[in-house]
Amino acid sequence: MNLSRRLPKTLAVTVPLAAILATAACGSGIEENTASATPVATAAVAAQAPADQAAKGTVASNRLTVATAGKAAQAALAKCQADGLGFVTVSVVDRAGNVQAMLRGDNAAQHTVEASRQKGYTAAAFGANTSDLAGRAKGDGATVADLEGTLFLPGGVAVKAGNASIAGIGVGGAPDGMADQACAAAGLDAIAGSLQ
């Protein structure tokens, strides 16, 4: 989907810049990953970067370890199975929406795979549970629901280290989104002691 056709020109530029700024604000240590900085930020934004990052030309970002992501996925699926909802899919994604762990329950339909990933990404990107974000996706004209890869339905939980959103746990497939949400929350509870 080409957002520049659907959003006013200033918003089409502001949304990617806001995403860059939000990503730069991530901080505190789960697993450190560095990547080359994209030359999109303005000089004013670059001037605000810590001196050590500016000298390196890279920024650090945190993500869950594979063991922690797997533990969250297993706990979320176990909760759904205990509730008689073993036909869901659980996805644990990093802040960029990259899948770190995924478990597909027995008889989970194909659409649950993408729904769980999108819910996890939406929670991670916005730093909030998707059940709390659903109201932002309503209205006339362009809304955040038009952002590609997002899904503003209950079932996504943000994973935070300190105040920084570093991942999301998404569950898709239960007949009620709040049941998906409860399973995702169980995944977060299982790893809460591992987050710094």
Kindly label every feature range from the protein language model:
Residues 21-25:
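C-terminal motif of bacterial Sec signal peptides marking the signal peptidase cleavage site
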Residues 13-20:
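Hydrophobic helical h-region of N-terminal Sec-dependent signal peptides
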Residues 3-13:
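Bacterial N-terminal signal peptides that target proteins for export
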Residues 27-196:
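Flexible, solvent-exposed loop/hinge segments and secondary-structure transition points
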